Amino acid sequence: MAVQKAAHLRAIETADPLGGPVPPAPMMPPGYRWHDDGPMPGLWLDPHPTEEGEKAMRLAGLFKVAAETRDAEGTGWGLLLQWRDPAGRQHEWAMPKAMLAGRKATVWEMLSDGGLFIAASEKARNRLADFLNLCRPNARAIAVDRTGWHDGLFVMPGRAYGANQTELAVYQGAPLPKGLMASRGTLEGWQQEIAAKADGNPRLALCLAAAFVGPIMELADAEGGGLHLRGDTSGGKTTCLKAAASVWGAHSAWVQTWRMTANGVESTAAQHSETLLCLDELRELAPRDAVTVPYMLAHGRAKGRQRAEGGLRRQAQWRVFFLSTGELGLADLAAQAGDKPAGGTDVRMIDIAADAGSGRGVWEALHAQPNPRAFADALNDAIGRNYGTAAPAFLERLAADKDGAREMIRASIDRWTAANVPADASAMVQRAGKRFALVAAAGDLARALGVLSWREGWAERAIAKLFKEWCEARGGLGAPEDERAMDAVRGFLATHGDARFEGLEATEQKPVHNRAGWWRHCQPEGARREWLLTAPAWREIAREAGLPTERVAKAAIAAGWLIPGRDRAAQSVALASFPKQR
């Protein structure tokens, strides 16, 4: 029987979602045919001539094998499948062929979940698997296992953005959450009802600008990381997170929780690479993972794993910018497990107070609403009606002139940094400043491309205000290690000053257990004390700070708390009846 092409299938071909030329029909393996006569259209298998008494078998509904896919290294082969569900909605899935070797049930589940009929019998499903293995479409496509930039194209499920596209590019990664690519309303509606409400509200402006950071990270040569809004539950943090999510799609799909394990980070990061990852309520992350999970997200690389046949699997990579909320900060959560974030963690995941200090939670301007609750309710209502339109417009315009955007981004970052980050700030503050500058540049670019309807300069001013608040909250422009060292010294003396130290001028000696040192009055005032610490006591302070003894000494000398010796190390003091102490 001749191959029959269903009108249903022709509709898919004439409206190719990839936007490129329609590929020729695939070469059909012997015995298989498309059939659209009667009530059971789809893929059928005719019985072999030697199988007397056998009937033709329906394997699946109508679908199209649009292209054969593989990654840039020539591995990860698969098929780009397209079909329409019973309601007429088009679906597309880049199926890895490796799934046919051991996870066929997942293949049938994915296709059935998208509304494609799949025969129930094991025999029929095995013949369908044979078809998918044997089918050789004429078109080829590059398949990627993460969203984002690939050879000049920005690849999202169902669409690749970029000019002069010579080859199809498709997403062939882990299945995405339902609704992730959904949209509702218009860009103009989103601008008027959501983006405009960020005027006068720096924290909302920060979150909306941050939603555009992902696609420009490569252009700015920026490392991964994120921002964390910390504060009370009723302050409006989650509403800001939902507003940011509305740039890309429905908040129900884009806003996730921190309730994940270190093993789940890789697929989540790959699904949100160079887009936006929204994570609500930090306290849902297990304290034992408080250090490793944020680090992995920012670091951009998966753990190396061994193949069963020997050698390492290809290491998954991503570039993620994430927004987070929670009542606790990362250091607070890590402390519950007796851990401390590694140096630089507070720059990879910048902690920002959610409370704006105006008595209105995160809000400062209510835009004619009577109170903060009414403003948040109106904004949440708007978020439910307007989403998923801003990111496609941004990507389309960004990809059309990627080189021009790169120049604008870098100039914006340099300008903002020069205006807001002091040259004598610590390296840690300067790194944080670059993170804030990146967010400001993203907001500025989105405005220039006509996606954010803000007045000129608002993104830069709003982000500058929050950077200044962040610097003040951390105690200045110094390194956080200095603050930890000083806190440890201050806490040690406050706790043990009377019990473990002996006064050198005391007329009456008393036993000192677990001695930490001595004290004496300073000259000429005599009202202040000078503390002489033993080497073991200094090591105890360093352990509390989580720093080397030399690093604590350096911080104490810089603060004027420790009198240095000739080599800028701690000064040695000789006491009668005691060995020399440092």
Regions found by a protein language model. Name each.
Residues 221, 269-271, 314-316:
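Solvent-exposed alpha-helices and their adjacent loops that cap or buttress functional pockets
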Residues 228, 238-290:
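AAA+/P-loop NTPase substrate/partner-engagement loops
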Residues 3-78, 84-94, 98-166, 269-276, ...:
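Extended alpha-helical interface modules used as scaffolds for assembling large macromolecular complexes
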Residues 223-225, 273-274, 318-319:
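Short coil/turn connectors at secondary-structure junctions
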Residues 164-250, 436:
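P-loop NTPase catalytic core of nucleic-acid-dependent motor ATPases
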Residues 197-205, 230-233, 267-268, 283, ...:
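Alpha-helix N-cap/helix-initiation motif
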Residues 228-235, 310-320:
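A glycine-rich phosphate-binding loop feature that marks nucleotide/adenosyl-phosphate handling sites
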